[in-house]
């Protein structure tokens, strides 16, 4: 409400300046023509009845009507029938009835009121017009039409000299391509720009814009919104503190506290800056990005410095997602990190690059590259290549390990079920009695292996081709035999909860393997 008061004061400031600049000298109102002139005391003292083709003049302004009651001394008259006030070559006012005070150059107009100025048309049933300030005012429902644009409001003000209109209450703006609803609007007609103050909605054929403050360039179909700006379409919406939108190019730029909701794919993306090129099917969001994927089982939280999206331009559905720099994600049953991640939504395949790691339960999966295949919103297959390395923390103190050039990990109910290790396959796993006491360590090498896992423990290994397998009893274990070359247990990097995805995790002394955690066996 305070903002609206400021707008009103600003709008009328120039009116006051104009008023003070006017000469205070009174000018006469002259009778230019009337078919009949009759003095009739019954109509009042000094009242002259003018009948038929009445024409009055004050300065350069002419007043036409069918009849009038005119008081020459007070410069006041009432006009009746076919009122026409012609002020200059471009401004005309029409109505059925009018009251005019020549002393203050102020007119009241009644019924079928029309103000016409160049290509602008104002219509209402009651209007006042101040000739000194060029201000037209209607207090109860009016319409301004300009070319193919139409503006309707309960209250309105129009300065015809500078072609600026001010609208209040139930404002509706209609153009061939859009419809706007707002509470307060200033329309600079020459600039073809509208400034709105208060809750505003702009409807397009496909999109809807909302905001509480901003402007709309109707000529170029460009809008800028602030304070809860929202762009929505079938299946998605973008909300931010401020937003720029170009309808012709279908380009949007969102700034500060950006919130994107995709109801089709059940995804919410948050950040502080984003851009969208809808016709090209491209968009991105950056600065403290958090993405949430909602599934039946749980929600996955993902962070990256920047997130890119590719959309189907026909269906408006997301096809691919690319996350870059400092990628970290968390779900109750799986966590991960890498420096870049791409997700093809159509074939449900995620690709992790640049030092990728996945954690599930007590397992760590690592490789130069990781591909994740998803079925029914659950992890189905994970491909580690090259240099795949899987580590499982033993129930007590050791680590079971699987290593190879290319590894395919199969999941069941989001738990590791078995692993096919192809190329220089190696394993280390701990053997224990039922009471947990250690028997020894099994170390094996083969061209390929198929490893069965139950309850996060290796239970069976099937070897292919040449195999070297050695069981080291507890009493004969050599130092370092329990760790494969390249072993790194990087639990410190693992996201621990949804908020931990923002942590800039780094390897600690323990994680880098400079202590007993580093694999030494060759």
Which residues does each PLM region occupy?
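N-terminal amphipathic/hydrophobic interface segments
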Residues: 21-522
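Bacterial Sec-dependent N-terminal signal peptides
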Residues: 1-29, 522
């Amino acid at each position: 409400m305070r903002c609206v008061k400021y707008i009103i004061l600003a709008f009328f400031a120039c009116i006051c300046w104009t008023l003070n600049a006017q000469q205070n000298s009174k000018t006469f109102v002259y009778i230019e023509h009337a078919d009949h002139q009759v003095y009739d005391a019954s109509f009042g003292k000094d009242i002259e009845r003018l009948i038929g083709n009445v024409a009055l003049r004050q300065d350069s302004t002419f007043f036409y009507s069918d009849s009038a009651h005119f008081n020459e001394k007070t410069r006041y008259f009432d006009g009746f029938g076919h009122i026409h006030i012609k002020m200059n070559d471009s401004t005309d006012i029409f109505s059925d009835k009018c009251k005019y005070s020549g002393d203050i150059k102020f007119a009241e107009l009644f019924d079928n009121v029309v103000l016409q100025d160049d290509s602008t048309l104002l219509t209402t049933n009651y209007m006042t017009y101040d000739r000194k300030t060029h201000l037209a005012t209607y207090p109860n429902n009016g319409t301004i039409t300009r070319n193919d644009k139409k503006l309707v409001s309960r209250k309105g003000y129009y300065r015809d000299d500078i072609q600026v209109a001010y609208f209040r209450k139930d404002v509706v703006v209609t153009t061939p391509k859009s419809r706007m609803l707002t509470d307060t609007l200033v329309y600079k007609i020459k600039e073809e720009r509208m400034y709105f103050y208060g809750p505003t909605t702009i409807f397009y054929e496909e999109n809807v814009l909302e905001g509480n403050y901003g402007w709309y360039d109707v000529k170029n179909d460009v809008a800028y919104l602030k304070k809860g700006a929202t762009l929505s379409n079938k299946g998605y919406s973008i909300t931010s503190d401020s937003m720029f939108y170009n309808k012709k190019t279908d380009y949007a730029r969102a700034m500060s506290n950006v919130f994107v909701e995709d109801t089709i794919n059940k995804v919410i993306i948050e950040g502080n800056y984003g851009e969208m090129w809808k016709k090209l099917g491209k968009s991105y969001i950056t600065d403290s990005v958090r993405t949430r994927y909602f599934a039946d089982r749980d929600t996955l939280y993902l962070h990256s410095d920047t997130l890119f999206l590719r959309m189907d331009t026909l269906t408006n559905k997301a096809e691919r997602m690319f996350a870059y720099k400092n990628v970290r994600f968390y779900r109750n049953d799986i966590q991960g990190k890498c420096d870049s991640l791409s997700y093809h939504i159509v074939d449900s395949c995620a690709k992790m690059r640049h030092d990728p790691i996945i954690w599930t339960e007590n397992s760590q999966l690592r490789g130069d590259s990781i591909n994740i295949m998803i079925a029914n919103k659950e992890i189905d297959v994970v491909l580690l290549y090259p240099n795949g390395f899987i580590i499982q923390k033993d129930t007590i103190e050791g680590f079971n390990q699987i290593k190879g050039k290319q590894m395919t990990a199969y999941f069941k109910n989001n738990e590791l079920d078995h692993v096919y290790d192809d190329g220089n396959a190696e394993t280390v796993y701990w053997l224990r009695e039922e009471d947990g006491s250690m028997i020894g360590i099994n170390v094996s090498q083969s061209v390929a292996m198929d490893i069965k896992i139950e309850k996060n423990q290796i239970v069976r290994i099937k070897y292919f081709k040449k195999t070297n397998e050695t069981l080291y009893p507890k009493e004969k274990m050599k130092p370092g035999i329990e760790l494969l070359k390249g072993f790194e247990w990087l639990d410190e990097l693992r996201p621990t909860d949804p908020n931990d995805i923002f942590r800039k995790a780094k390897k600690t002394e323990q994680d880098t393997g400079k202590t007993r955690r580093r694999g030494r066996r060759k």
